[in-house]
Regions:
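Active-site capping/gating regions of soluble enzymes
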Residues: 41-46, 68-85, 94, 98-160
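Phosphate/oxyanion-binding active-site loops and adjacent basic polyanion-contact surfaces
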Residues: 26-37, 59-69, 106, 159
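Extended, charge-enriched "interface" segments that sit outside catalytic cores
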Residues: 1-47
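Glycine- and acidic
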Residues: 17-29, 48-60, 88-97, 144-157
Length: 160
């Protein structure tokens, strides 16, 4: 799918509280593993709180759809909640920009992500839950893959 097609699909899903699948629906092996992991996280956070998990780090973030897909998966696993403003993700979603192309696209990816209504609602919810005096969005900037991607000099320059 193109990025535009992925975004259209994800936007539709994020406007719905209904599950995309059922707990017993047959999924592929990778999807089953991911959902089992997320459901384990949901059970754990229900018992110990969301601070026990930290954040969902999205390795090799290349586009907005990479980040929004995490929200849909979180919804499927019960890691979202409905607020007066709308649905939010209980756990922060953190982009990890690793290649030189991704580092260069980083400002546009972050602008789109931070301006997205689901992200804005989620950041406000997370702020309220942690009683922080400010909204907080973590961003990880990778070194090793950008180094492999373009060499030491190009990697350092793009990280700078």
């Amino acid at each position: 799918w193109s990025e535009a097609e992925r975004l259209t699909f994800l936007e539709t899903e994020l406007h719905s509280a209904r599950p995309f699948t059922t707990a017993k629906a047959p999924l592929g092996a990778e999807a089953t593993t991911v959902m089992a992991c997320l459901r384990t996280i949901e059970r754990h956070t229900a018992h110990y709180g969301t601070n026990c998990i930290g954040s969902f780090i999205v390795s090799m973030t290349r586009s907005l759809s990479d980040l929004l897909a995490v929200y849909v998966l979180a919804r499927e696993a019960g890691l979202t909640v409905m607020t007066d403003e709308g649905m939010v993700c209980k756990i922060p979603v953190v982009p990890l920009l690793e290649t030189i192309d991704d580092l260069e696209a980083g400002p546009a990816i972050l602008q789109a992500f931070l301006s997205h209504p689901f992200t804005q609602r989620s950041l406000r919810y997370q702020q309220q839950q942690t009683q922080a005096g400010y909204l907080k969005q973590q961003v990880m900037v990778g070194y090793s893959d950008s180094n492999k991607d373009g060499g030491i000099l190009a990697s350092q320059w793009n990280l700078y």
